């Protein structure tokens, strides 16, 4: 029970203070903002709790409609899946026909069924120029163990689906409970502009490398990821059988089939029939 006494400086409390002393009750909007922030952090940093599988995206090559600028373009790709952003190396002097053959391993949060892909021209003395973009829906057949090798239309200055095409090879693997993947991701604030898409807000992006945990987030136990066995002997044998397919594409298929050579051959045969 608290009592009040008067002093030269005014009234003061003596004894127990009320539970809401010096506390400001948040409004409904503030509570919603806090809940949204917590949900975003769980998707962004959460390991096994929010992850349902691993999506492997091989960015093979692109055939663009136009070379913008006076010199040959230096294109690179940026993939945004959930709250994570991944980039390929720059294809220097790639111009209209850049080749990357970059394999990107992405964790897929619950409820995410698509990703956003952009192609930029790397500039030395100015902002990188965005050339093309597309929104890719993750094929349902991937969860059944198939490998998808498709060309996707790109939108850009030439118009919707008129900026060229990009070749992607995708596979999907379920992750055992407790497995935690923490590849380097680039976290960039974005804003949606009508007719343009998601555009990065000016500023320095925050990069979290493997092993780094943002302040205030619990450190998830690191479990070594069990990579599918892919021996050089099997890789060379399949490369001899399918000389028209890229080496990294064959490696991705073998890993997606958990090292099962017969299953990998069937998937590669299916891919060559579709080419």
From Swiss-Prot:
All copies of domain CUE, residue ranges: 230-273
Motif (AIM1): 133-136
Localisation: Cytoplasm; Endosome; Early endosome
Entries under CDD domains matching the protein: C2_Tollip (cd04016), CUE_TOLIP (cd14363)
A Pfam family recorded for this sequence: CUE
C2 domain location: 35-152
Subunit structure: Interacts with ATG8 family proteins (via AIM motifs), and ubiquitin (via CUE domain). Found in a complex with TOM1; interacts (via N-terminus) with TOM1 (via GAT domain); the interactions leads to TOM1-recruitment to endosomes and inhibition of TOLLIP binding to PtdIns(3)P.
Official protein name in the record: Toll-interacting protein
Organism (species): Salmo salar
């Amino acid at each position: 029970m608290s009592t009040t006494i008067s002093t030269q400086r005014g009234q003061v409390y003596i004894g127990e203070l009320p539970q809401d002393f010096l506390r400001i009750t948040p409004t409904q909007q503030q509570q919603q903002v806090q809940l949204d922030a917590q949900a975003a952090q769980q998707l962004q940093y959460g390991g096994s709790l929010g992850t349902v599988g691993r999506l492997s995206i091989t960015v093979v090559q692109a055939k663009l409609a136009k070379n913008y600028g006076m010199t040959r373009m230096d294109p690179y790709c940026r993939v945004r899946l959930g709250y994570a952003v991944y980039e390929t190396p720059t294809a220097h002097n790639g111009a209209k026909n850049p080749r990357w053959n970059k394999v990107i391993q992405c964790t897929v949060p619950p409820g995410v069924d698509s990703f956003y892909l952009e192609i930029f021209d790397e500039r030395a003395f100015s902002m990188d120029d965005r050339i093309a973009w597309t929104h890719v829906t993750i094929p349902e057949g991937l969860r059944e163990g198939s490998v998808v090798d498709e060309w996707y239309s790109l939108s850009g200055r030439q118009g919707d689906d008129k900026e060229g095409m990009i070749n992607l090879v995708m596979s999907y693997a379920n992750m055992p409970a407790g497995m935690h993947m923490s590849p380097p991701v680039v976290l960039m604030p974005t804003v949606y502009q009508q007719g343009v898409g998601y555009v990065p807000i000016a500023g320095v992006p925050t990069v979290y490398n493997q092993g780094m945990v943002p302040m205030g987030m619990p450190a998830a136990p690191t479990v070594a990821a069990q990579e599918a066995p892919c021996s050089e002997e099997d890789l060379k044998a399949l490369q001899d059988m399918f000389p028209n397919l890229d080496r990294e594409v064959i490696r991705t298929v073998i890993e997606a089939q958990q090292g099962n050579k017969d299953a990998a051959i069937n998937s590669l045969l299916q891919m060559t029939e579709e080419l």
